[in-house]
Amino acid sequence: MFVLLFRFVFGGSISTGQPGGYVQLLMPGIVVQTVAFTLAGTASGLAEDLKKGLIDRFRSLPISQSALVVGRTLGDSMLNIVVLVVMALAGLAVGWRPSSGIVKVLIGFVFLFMFGYALSWVGIFVGLSVADARVVQNVGFIVTFPLTFLSNAFAPTTGMPRVLQYFAEWNPVSTMVAGCRELFGLKNIFGATAGSFPSENPLLMSAIYMGVIMLIFIPLSIRKYKNSSN
């Protein structure tokens, strides 16, 4: 729905000055947004499993205490592969044509996969921290919506108020979108202020963000799960 909405409703009013028009810049933003929603999906799914008692059944089995949460993140990440394929096909259907070659496109999708995997660990922590599945889903969307819409995913950040522009420049969604645009063969005209570190090094910043997220939330989530099982 977002692909069709932005492509055919809003796309005609946004000039990019690049071959292929708005859809070429739109698709990386839409795909990153979709992957970012992994956080909410993982959190609400885990909370629902806790509510139904499925987690208690797994705890009674002779398996590692961390196996459940690791399996949950890997399972949701595998689902992301299907989502990425569907999004790519939808993009191709509405005119998206990456021009960088198959190798760079595949690297871009690997980055997207890893971004979703990192965010799924945030979702695990949120799902274990909030008991109510409905509240968990709301918390997940409260986190992901500002990150996706206060970014360069759909429009230039240069027109934002300076405070919001600064946030958007360092937003991990913005760096992921900018990095994917580069890997897909596009100049990121919706990027941050020229010369800023995120705009000059979006792929490096994305890798740093993913590493920091996993470094923080993998041990936190496993510890949270072990404490809750006690």
Residue ranges and their predicted role:
Residues 8-10, 127-174:
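Transmembrane helix segments
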Residues 65, 69-140, 201-221:
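Alpha-helical transmembrane segments and their short interhelical loops
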Residues 3-8, 181-230:
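Alpha-helical transmembrane segments of multi-pass membrane transporters/translocases
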